[in-house]
């Protein structure tokens, strides 16, 4: 096979339309509430479901990680999560692979893992339209990126599956599916009672932190925002430094183990704005006052809608949190 260079146009938008863009964004299936799916199934069958989909007083399906207890009396469990970055992979298949892993990890991060990041094992489910020009080369690059990124993080990918005939033929045309990898993550949870939920808590003197895991720019390519603007985007964010990502992950694990977090949520579909909104949705009479002055990026649209890997945390112990983040060289 041969490599093909595919270029997509950058996203055009008007900052003054941010409120309408938000309304449109929240109606996308990838972003909108999933209660149509979760509310029709038993979410606690067997009695060992320690953390199911729903959170908060309003029981909205917002939790990033699922946790099953190992027995009825102990505090150990198994944490699971998934991640994907389909549109991101259209722009850059290597970035798409790393973003899929990053999403799975920033989902499972809210459960205290016995050995931190080293506790995690991944499964890769490949869905790709092979035997079409350029796609075999893209698949090779994507698989190599998963391998390299996982090795750099010190985690394994012992299993997976593939569907490599993702093309539908008609009488006069063909439609190929976008090459996609779905990453599943699993690890041993050391204390099922310490799992952090994405629901802001009404306490005095609390602080909200944004932690950037990617060290990339606030690109809009491959985002849900790009979709509502009828585009894909020219550039997609990636993970620039696996070592820094690993430091961020283990720092958050330390915060969880020391009971320093009130709430936490990853940034994925919909970007930072969706993350902040979701953390307010699950309780009555709850809101947040957010200032974007501390960002080097001055375009609020990019800050709020970019889906580069990162998390939002809430704490009432800012001094202790600052000390731990500083000790891990996280700014």
Where are the language model's segments positioned?
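Glycine/proline-enriched, intrinsically flexible loops and inter-domain linkers
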Residues: 1-331
